[in-house]
Amino acid sequence: MQFDYIIIGAGSAGNVLATRLTEDPNTSVLLLEAGGPDYRFDFRTQMPAALAFPLQGKRYNWAYETEPEPFMNNRRMECGRGKGLGGSSLINGMCYIRGNALDLDNWAQEPGLENWSYLDCLPYYRKAETRDMGENDYHGGDGPVSVTTSKPGVNPLFEAMIEAGVQAGYPRTDDLNGYQQEGFGPMDRTVTPQGRRASTARGYLDQAKSRPNLTIRTHAMTDHIIFDGKRAVGVEWLEGDSTIPTRATANKEVLLCAGAIASPQILQRSGVGNAELLAEFDIPLVHELPGVGENLQDHLEMYLQYECKEPVSLYPALQWWNQPKIGAEWLFGGTGVGASNHFEAGGFIRSREEFAWPNIQYHFLPVAINYNGSNAVKEHGFQCHVGSMRSPSRGHVRIKSRDPHQHPAILFNYMSHEQDWQEFRDAIRITREIMHQPALDQYRGREISPGVECQTDEQLDEFVRNHAETAFHPCGTCKMGYDEMSVVDGEGRVHGLEGLRVVDASIMPQIITGNLNATTIMIGEKIADMIRGQEALPRSTAGYFVANGMPVRAKK
């Protein structure tokens, strides 16, 4: 089998590339996905409110676990990644957050990455998006990804939580993806007008999958990339339960889009990476790149949970006898409780003046429950997810064998710097202050977790060690740049090799201030134009907020 391009991984970036490259009818593309189709009749991936379900099994989740995390009481921590058409956009929380403009301006400070500034990238965010409120300087009106805004009157807790943040002295922002990210406001979501999850399989592949020049293979587990000298010329994979490899050749390029955990694994199995690691598994060295699998970053978060004094939380929706009605309303009308991910309010703040842009993120949820649906509190409640955004902690992803089915060694080194501990202590104390503003007085009952007895630095640190969880935002393991630990250049091309790019969250040099999905899609759109040799979209002239030493919050 011969194709112009072979794309490994039908996720948030791979589906963008498959769709854009096949717009040229003379370009043939093979898209390989280790998971299955995104079954449209499966409410677990299609109903926004069911977002916890795909994380509980292994049909749609790789369900990786970390090595014992040394600064987290040696816990082995969850590292869920999407499996199936759509990748992690098939199982994520559907929060459409782009990050802060200064994240990208910070990337663009690196020599060779100048065209990754916010104003260079904004046109590609807009190209990908159809926002239900229409287009403007910041938002698109006819892109493949449906973005839904929060509507007034959904749940009184959302507005009360935003108002509480404002009462605590922080800014209000009408659009976390617009002129000003800093502050509290409504949160956009990747949900269609029909109340369905807007994964990249739905948004992108639906328009491309009938094209004769696109071949999609699901249940295709990539074993390794085939090289001729320093040139990538094809891919070998295992289909279904078969142990006999299938191979195809790429006339132009192999595009690795398997995500921050799998992309470095595939490079390592293919002979690209740290020479000592590859020698350990007798993998012939194709090209030494010590940065492959290093620079692993993530967002860590924790929940502050409160009893709700009024019966306005989502607690009744957790009762089995209410679920048939909720399901029917969603299935036939695309409305009701099932049509939202219920992360409809949030915010970004600076915890201290030393941060030039927000370093703490909030997601508000009108029910007290773990992200994966476990440990639901048996009463009306609400919670605040809070975590730091740009931890200095760095980890790694390293293969444990040549077997593509074996999970790698993943270590994030969460909380390995003093800055991490200071940020979490600040975050918990600021959150408590916000939760005790007048706007929440009528709703706020007792603090369920961590509990009022948890007050000292030592007590807060111990709570974080035992209870903080991943926000499922791994990135950085094939970082873009030109230093000795970089893996790809500013166009995603792997250093020292030909015909091979990495295009996914692994190429982010530094983690962004917010959820990763929107930016991963943007990366796919931007590099698709580079691959096609098209001129970049004209740089935006939109304005954006920079704090420039402004006080963190208004004095009361």
Swiss-Prot record:
Any Pfam family the entry gives: GMC_oxred_C
EC assignment: 1.1.99.1, 1.2.1.8
Location in or out of the cell: Cell membrane
Keyword Endoplasmic reticulum: no
Record GO cellular component, one term: membrane
Essential cofactor(s): FAD
Listed GO biological process terms: glycine betaine biosynthetic process from choline; response to osmotic stress
Induction profile: By osmotic stress. Choline is required for full expression. Oxygen and choline exert their control via the transacting DNA-binding proteins ArcA and BetI, respectively.
Known function: Involved in the biosynthesis of the osmoprotectant glycine betaine. Catalyzes the oxidation of choline to betaine aldehyde and betaine aldehyde to glycine betaine at the same rate.
PANTHER family in the cross-refs: CHOLINE DEHYDROGENASE, MITOCHONDRIAL (PTHR11552:SF147), GLUCOSE-METHANOL-CHOLINE GMC OXIDOREDUCTASE (PTHR11552)
Name used for this protein in its record: Oxygen-dependent choline dehydrogenase
Organism: Escherichia coli (strain K12)
Lineage: Bacteria, Pseudomonadati, Pseudomonadota, Gammaproteobacteria, Enterobacterales
